[in-house]
Amino acid sequence: MKPGKPLAFGAVRRQAASGAQASAPSEGSSAMEAETFFVGLPGNPVSSFVTFLLFVRPFLLRLGGAHDVAPRAISLRADFTQAKADRRNEFLRARINAAGGLELFPNQSSAVLTSTVWGDGLIDNPPNHAISAGETVRFLPFSELLG
């Protein structure tokens, strides 16, 4: 995905301290084991922001007992052309304009954090897909991603 690499996720199993309360055992583990999860986010600020919103936040919500953690996307008109298709799923910073369509932040570099302040959300652009003006695209509002 772009922006958002590299992303690391894992779990470390450890023996619970004597007398300590262990978490509920998962399949194949004993009651005396506990799991600690870790996430490694990318170094560029926009990459970290996007991967946190799409992967880490939903994971933390699920750990907290939430069930419906998937953000609801809306379909909006692209008022721009993105001729260069990327081989990866790309999340473009965009905002809703006065006409109700979407406009792109001019610089989609993962180092430009101001694109996240300027924008209203992310366009979820599938791999190898160029966007034409007037096309309907999948938009994830920050209000959905941030809760």
Language model feature labels by segment:
Residues 1-147:
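Flexible glycine/proline-rich
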